[in-house]
């Protein structure tokens, strides 16, 4: 199993190109099931989850072509199987996103209950409740969600804000008979990106980017060409890496307007930030200052950046509190950071961080996707060598992270065994 070996190597300097967002690419790929036409996606990150989604769609009969760099062509005209099996779904929660489009287009779907990162309860009850409100008959048996029925437009008020639930119901509503009103929608940039692509495909959606979307169902959707929105979490991860090591790095193919709260927190930590329409520059010449973090739904501070800022706060001047309100059990990186010399205690959903002057390298284990990113960031500033194990988590969400960081001066290498 691959590992990353990391050693501090001074400030980072240069340019990094940000990949497309995994959390946008996966639902966009699933949207290919809504049409018999061809959906052409650009700026797709070549990640483990993307490849799993490719296999899943191909297993359902869709024709999926890729240049293995950043482009995919998905044709749903050849779909001949409405079942998403456990073997693929178990590794990735986003697999549940085939449920809505498959049911809407074919009138039936079977999807194994999903897997993914072990960061607490992330149930799919809102997905199922919404589809039932639209007329679906749903049973759960033998580990599968089995749904059938012709969907009809209705009012769906989600009990909690859910990104995946919003995406699943939005896709389903595009082909439902009549008008669907989706209330308490997630407004993350990735949801907006999906909605904008669906409109290109012929969907009639109003209220995009707000908590209430109105969808007028159409008889069919067409293919289109769409570029995946840049990954704000990958961009934020690289910015934290520069903030902890010092230096100046420019991120290209970035989307600063999707991550303003993260940029504000970096400024609060002492970084100088400049940004244009599609680039972000960070200049860090001092020890970071501790910053309080409270994760909330977009447009607040994203839970997917909590672990990276925990690493930054670990070596910051002063003390702070980090409050996690989105997921329980999302402090699994804390014991690993403490193994490196951090001074972090937890109480319920709150972590108390007392900054130390320097961390020391250690062998640490990645426990989930963003936790693994925090350990990489910590290793860049630690004295001695850090070895991050179980980096298959990292590969689910970061495209060539060691090459990108290495290109700006980080001492980081992937090793086998």
Curated annotation (Swiss-Prot):
SUPFAM superfamilies membership: EPT/RTPC-like
Pfam families: EPSP_synthase
Catalytic activity reported: phosphoenolpyruvate + UDP-N-acetyl-alpha-D-glucosamine = UDP-N-acetyl-3-O-(1-carboxyvinyl)-alpha-D-glucosamine + phosphate
GO molecular function, one term: UDP-N-acetylglucosamine 1-carboxyvinyltransferase activity
Localization of this protein: Cytoplasm
Entry annotation: catalytic residues: 117
Pathway: Cell wall biogenesis; peptidoglycan biosynthesis
InterPro entries: Enolpyruvate_Tfrase_dom, Enolpyruvate_Tfrase_sf, MurA_subfamily, RNA3'P_cycl/enolpyr_Trfase_a/b, UDP_GlcNAc_COvinyl_MurA
Catalytic class of the enzyme: transferase
Residues modified as 2-(S-cysteinyl)pyruvic acid O-phosphothioketal: 117
Keyword Cell cycle: yes
GO biological process terms held by the UniProt record: cell division; cell wall organization; peptidoglycan biosynthetic process; regulation of cell shape; UDP-N-acetylgalactosamine biosynthetic process
A GO-annotated cellular component: cytoplasm
Residues bound to phosphoenolpyruvate: 22-23
E.C. no: 2.5.1.7
First-listed, main subcellular location of the protein, grouped into a coarse class: cytoplasm
Keywords, ordered alphabetically: Cell cycle, Cell division, Cell shape, Cell wall biogenesis/degradation, Cytoplasm, Peptidoglycan synthesis, Pyruvate, Transferase
Family statement: Belongs to the EPSP synthase family. MurA subfamily.
Protein's job: Cell wall formation. Adds enolpyruvyl to UDP-N-acetylglucosamine.
Protein name, UniProt field: UDP-N-acetylglucosamine 1-carboxyvinyltransferase
Organism per entry: Neisseria meningitidis serogroup B (strain ATCC BAA-335 / MC58)
Source taxonomy: Bacteria, Pseudomonadati, Pseudomonadota, Betaproteobacteria, Neisseriales
């Amino acid at each position: 199993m691959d590992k990353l070996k990391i050693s501090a190597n001074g400030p980072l300097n240069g340019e990094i190109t940000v990949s497309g967002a995994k959390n946008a690419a996966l639902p966009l790929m699933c949207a290919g099931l809504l049409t018999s036409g061809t959906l052409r996606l650009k700026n797709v990150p070549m990640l483990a989850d993307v490849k799993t989604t490719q296999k899943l769609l191909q297993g359902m009969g869709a024709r999926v072509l890729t240049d293995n760099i950043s482009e995919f062509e998905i044709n749903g005209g050849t779909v001949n199987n409405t079942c998403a099996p456990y073997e693929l779904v178990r590794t990735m929660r986003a697999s549940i996103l085939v449920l809505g489009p498959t049911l809407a287009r074919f009138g039936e779907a079977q999807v194994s209950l999903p897997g993914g990162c072990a960061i607490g309860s992330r149930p799919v009850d809102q997905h199922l409740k919404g589809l039932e409100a639209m007329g679906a008959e749903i049973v759960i048996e033998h580990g599968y969600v089995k749904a059938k029925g012709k969907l009809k437009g209705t009012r769906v008020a989600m009990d909690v804000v859910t990104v995946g639930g919003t995406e699943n119901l939005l896709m389903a509503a595009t082909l439902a008979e009549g008008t669907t009103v989706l209330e308490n929608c997630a407004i993350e940039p990735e949801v907006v990106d999906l909605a904008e692509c669906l409109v290109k495909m012929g969907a009639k959606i109003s209220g995009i980017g707000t908590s209430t979307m109105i969808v007028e169902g159409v008889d069919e959707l067409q293919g289109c060409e769409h570029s995946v929105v840049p990954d704000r979490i990958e961009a934020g991860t690289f910015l934290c890496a520069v903030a902890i090591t010092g230096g100046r790095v420019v991120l290209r193919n970035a989307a600063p307007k999707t991550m303003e709260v993260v940029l504000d927190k970096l400024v609060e930590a002492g970084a100088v930030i400049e940004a244009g329409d599609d680039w972000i520059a960070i200049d860090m010449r001092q020890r970071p200052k501790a910053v309080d973090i409270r994760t909330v739904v977009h447009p607040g501070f994203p839970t997917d950046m909590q672990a990276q800022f925990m690493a930054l706060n670990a070596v910051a001047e002063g003390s702070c509190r980090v409050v996690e309100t989105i997921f329980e059990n999302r402090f699994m990186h804390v014991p690993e950071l403490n193994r490196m010399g951090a001074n972090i205690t937890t109480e319920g959903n709150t972590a108390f961080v007392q900054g130390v002057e320097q961390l020391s390298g250690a062998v640490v284990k990645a426990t989930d996707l963003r936790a693994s990113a925090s350990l990489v960031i910590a290793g860049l500033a630690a004295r001695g060598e850090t070895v991050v194990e179980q980096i298959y988590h990292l590969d689910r969400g970061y495209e060539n992270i060691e090459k990108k960081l290495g290109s700006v001066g980080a001492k980081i290498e992937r090793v086998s065994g």
